[in-house]
Regions:
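Short, basic/aromatic-enriched C-terminal tail that caps enzymatic domains
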Residues: 198, 259-278
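FNR/FR-type flavoprotein reductase catalytic core
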Residues: 102-240
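Local cysteine-cluster metal-coordination motifs and their immediate loop/turn environment
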Residues: 149, 216-217, 238-267
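Nucleotide-activated chemistry modules centered on ATP-dependent adenylation/adenylyltransferase
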Residues: 219, 225, 245, 269-278
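Ferredoxin-reductase
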Residues: 13-114
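Short, low-complexity, intrinsically disordered N-terminal peptides in bacterial proteins
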Residues: 1-29, 131-135, 275-278
Length: 278
């Protein structure tokens, strides 16, 4: 994007959702204290006892303190954005990772005793359900590694219908992270044979309020279904981010009211604000 283009984009963004504290708690070096696997997913536990409690749906920027080659100046250079999946009583933060490239490969290889650089919590999380009347019925919809923000949100809500979609049985091992969830797999190897949105449609009755995170095609299907049934929905969008606090404009997405940066105005957006996802 040209300098003039960035200036115009910055002008269109200014004031859209109010001012932000860009990096409210600073970057800090923290130890990895837990690691477990669920199929292709790695759940990494990071000790952050003095850090602020994240809101469900917020994220953090993570990078291995020691990169490939053993030095702090080795590749990969940039951190990666991950939803906070869970916060334990001792301040431990859990993150759900999947090895899909150099940055996540390095993070997935970390073990207890290694350190990470963490910046967060960042962004806007899920807004609580409308208290009614009528009482709202939360429905959580996740796809793949998009289960992460639904874990902490499910913990906070306590009582919600959770629907999870995965590629196959190996990936569906991640469903164990949200007990009681109903599962759909593309190949029919676990649960419903088909898309998770096929499980969602019957749930869109009176009082339903949807919260979703997953790949763009899934989120677009959720958005369209909820619009068709006049059901409110909040979508946690995924995007590559270089900074996490609004400086790089790498996570800009269009809405009905103009462009927003997912790292400061999201990653959770009202579905009604989006004409389309992806």
């Amino acid at each position: 994007m040209s300098g003039a283009g960035k200036h115009a984009l910055a002008s269109s963004l200014r004031g859209t959702r109010g001012d932000r504290t860009l990096a409210p708690f600073g970057r800090r070096r923290l130890p990895v204290v837990a690691r477990e696997t669920h199929g292709p997913y790695v759940v990494l536990g990071v000790a952050d006892p003095d850090g602020p409690a994240p809101d469900p749906g917020q994220f953090a920027m993570l990078a291995a303190a020691e990169r490939w080659g053993g030095g702090e100046d080795e590749r990969p250079f940039l951190p990666r954005a991950f939803s906070v999946a869970r916060r334990h009583g001792d301040g431990r933060l859990d993150f759900v990772l999947e090895d899909v490239g150099p940055g996540t490969e390095r993070l997935c290889a970390l073990e207890p005793g290694d350190d990470v650089w963490l910046l967060g919590p960042l962004g806007r999380g899920f807004a609580p359900p409308d208290p009614g009347p009528p009482a709202r019925r939360p429905v959580l919809v996740g796809g793949g590694v998009g289960i992460a923000p639904l874990m902490i949100w499910s913990d906070a809500l306590g009582d919600a219908t959770t629907l999870l979609g995965f590629r196959d049985a190996a990936h569906a091992a991640g469903a164990a992270l949200i007990p009681g969830a109903r599962v759909a797999t593309d190949d029919g190897s676990v649960g419903h044979h088909g898309l998770v949105t096929e499980l969602l449609a019957p749930e869109l009755g009176p009082g339903a309020e949807v919260y979703a995170c997953g790949p763009p095609p899934m989120l677009e299907a959720v958005r369209a279904l909820c619009a068709e049934h006049d059901v409110p929905a909040q979508l946690a969008l995924e995007s590559g981010m270089a900074c996490g606090f609004g400086a790089c404009f790498g996570c800009v997405v269009p809405t009905r009211d103009g462009y927003v940066r997912l790292c400061v105005d999201g990653p959770v957006l009202d579905a009604a604000a989006l004409a389309e996802v992806g």
